[in-house]
Swiss-Prot record:
It comes from Grus japonensis. Disulfide bonds join C6-C36, C14-C33, C22-C54. Glycans are attached at N43. The keyword Glycosyltransferase does not apply. Its main location: secreted. Residues 4-54 form the Kazal-like domain. One of its GO terms (molecular function) is serine-type endopeptidase inhibitor activity. Keywords: Disulfide bond, Glycoprotein, Protease inhibitor, Repeat, Secreted, Serine protease inhibitor. It comes from the Eukaryota. This is Ovomucoid. The record marks L16, E17 as: Reactive bond 3. It is found in: Secreted. GO terms for cellular component: extracellular region. InterPro entries: Bifunctional_prot_inhibitor, Kazal_dom, Kazal_dom_sf, Prot_inh_Kazal-m.
């Protein structure tokens, strides 16, 4: 499975960069920052399904 290191994301303001990530919740996150914030908010229950749109 694909993994993403979110340890360097202490909830910064995310950029508008578009590099989509598909989460295990079947939602597409626009970039790593938005995905990592969602991972933190989920207490680690959200994982990466794959890179790219869901």
């Amino acid at each position: 499975t694909a993994t993403v290191d979110c340890s360097d994301y202490p909830k910064p303001a995310c950029t508008l960069e578009y590099m989509p990530f598909c989460g295990s919740d079947s939602k597409t996150y626009s970039n790593k920052c938005n995905f990592c914030n969602a991972v933190v908010d989920s207490n680690g229950t959200l994982t990466l399904s794959h890179f790219g749109k869901c």
